[in-house]
């Protein structure tokens, strides 16, 4: 069994193909929690909003648990803890806690700088932080931001060159995807300077509502259908065992059938997980994001 695992781990991603598609805008990067955690100091442990780096899901659940008196058994599930906190402090109290953590300008990492250099017309993230936006601003590149809105079947949009947010029906959203990259914050986001615009998919009820809107065509903007259909997906920082992600991708692939393979960079994956995704034309490569970026940059410098 161990030798089989070593053989699987020795398989390298198709770096030249991935770079070629990234450079030409033929890849949609999907950023999970691990993308933000890749910026943390090694062996760091988050304890409170005073820390200079972002929390993991478990650390955030532990913090909300300590603040709310959640009757935990050390098996902390963020969705359940957030649901309990909502019941104890109200939605406003939960959102205030999240805003205090995710609205800050943390140091973004090499991954975010790398993505801000690319021609990708669309970047999808399920993170609440603003690291990818900060990277675009550092590069001086204009970009659109589209945020799933928890409080209504709408999306919040800030267009390239505009400082104003507007609420739009996702089926009627019009954007020039070729004119400026678009960041789609599929699970909401903190909005620095405008906490009333914050939106977080974080409780059990939030996920039920999100999946309901997915079925009703009010969660994902229709304008993203064409790039979803005609692009490779590159998953960075995800644990692909997450059933919520499986449901979301099943819906995307059902509504916008694709003929393109997808790739995932993940530190560890079990055989069942690997087989499940292989059947959906998604190959998991076991490596760190940092090692993946080193290899891709080597290819970029060579070609």
Where do the model's predicted regions map?
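SIR2/sirtuin NAD+-dependent deacylase catalytic core
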Residues: 1-303
């Amino acid at each position: 069994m161990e030798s089989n695992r070593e053989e699987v781990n020795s398989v390298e991603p198709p770096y030249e193909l991935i770079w070629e598609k990234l450079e030409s805008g033929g890849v949609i990067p999907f950023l999970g929690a691990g993308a933000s955690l890749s910026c943390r100091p090694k062996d760091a442990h988050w304890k409170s909003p005073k820390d200079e780096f972002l929390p993991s899901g478990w650390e955030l659940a532990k913090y909300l648990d300590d603040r709310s008196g959640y009757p935990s058994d050390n098996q902390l599930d963020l969705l359940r803890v957030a649901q309990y906190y909502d019941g104890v402090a109200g939605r406003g109290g939960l959102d205030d806690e999240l805003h205090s953590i995710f609205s800050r300008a943390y140091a973004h990492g090499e991954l975010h700088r790398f993505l801000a250099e690319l021609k990708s017309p669309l970047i999808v993230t399920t993170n609440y932080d603003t690291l990818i936006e900060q990277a675009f601003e550092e590069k001086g590149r204009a970009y659109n931001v589209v945020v799933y809105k928890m409080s209504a079947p709408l999306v919040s949009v800030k267009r390239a060159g505009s400082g104003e947010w507007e609420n739009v029906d996702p089926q009627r959203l019009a954007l020039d995807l070729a004119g400026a990259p678009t960041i789609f914050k599929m699970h909401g986001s903190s909005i620095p300077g405008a906490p009333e615009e914050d939106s977080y998919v974080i409780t059990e009820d939030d996920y039920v509502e999100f999946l309901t809107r997915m079925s009703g065509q009010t969660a994902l903007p229709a304008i993203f259908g064409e790039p979803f259909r005609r692009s490779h997906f590159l998953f960075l920082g995800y644990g692909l065992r997450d059933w919520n992600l499986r449901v979301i991708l099943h819906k995307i692939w059902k509504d916008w059938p694709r003929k393109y393979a997808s790739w995932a960079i993940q530190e560890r994956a079990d055989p069942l997980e690997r087989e499940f995704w292989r059947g959906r034309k998604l190959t998991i490569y076991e490596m760190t994001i940092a090692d993946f970026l080193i290899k891709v940059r080597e290819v970029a410098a060579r070609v």
